[in-house]
Amino acid sequence: MTKSLTFILLSFHTLCCMGGNTITTAKQPTLDDLDKVISASKEYTKKYEQEVGYIKSKYVHAKSAQDKLSASRELFTKYKSFKLDSAYAYAERKLHYARILHNYEDSVYSELDIADIFNKTGIYVESYKILSGLEHKPMSADMRRYYFSLYGNLYEGLRETSITAYQRTENERRRIMFRDSLKNMKNKQSDWDKAEFLCSQNKYTDALHCLSNSFKNLSYEDRDMGYVAFSISDIYRQINETDKEKQYLIISAIADLKN
């Protein structure tokens, strides 16, 4: 469910050209709202750069491995949605300091974060090396959810790049296996996980209901707003509700610009 602002804006332009006006009720954003945010984008970019600069200063001046780990964690979070090369660099650094500190949780999360970046950039062999080298039994419930989700994403990527029908079938079988492992976990799943599973079953109405639970609790200042709105838009795309697809693309674009 990762996306770039450029993709959102290009997609939205295409939709507008395809026909129809956007919905303009009081609670729904319009193109004018998006234009206002775009005009103020320099302000948001400046704020983001200031925050990153401040954390980088903390990292440079940190004296202890614990402080280096903390700053690396913050910088990874800042970069993971926008600059994967920088996110990768700080994921490696937080893994380095976590190992020095014998911090199991940060070590595992760092390896999972690196595998996630490899998945997103199509480096599936390296992602598999990391995931297959991890033992999931000692993991916390959140770690296991992340782990199973990454394995599912890995095999989805391999399925899409398969050359033969046999490879496609086998990768799809493995994707479903990890999807089911995620679904069958006894611990409560997030609305995001539930929606992704429901979409894989073509249960789009149920998926929208799950995501609406998260959406109604978010504002434009929440980083997750962009992801949730984009996911809702993508569901509407799949069921050919173009007006609502456009509406949530605008919301996603505004949230991304503000964060």
PLM feature segments, named:
Residues 16-259:
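A "functional boundary" signal
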Residues 6-16:
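Bacterial N-terminal signal peptides
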Residues 1-2:
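N-terminal secretory signal peptides that target proteins for export/translocation
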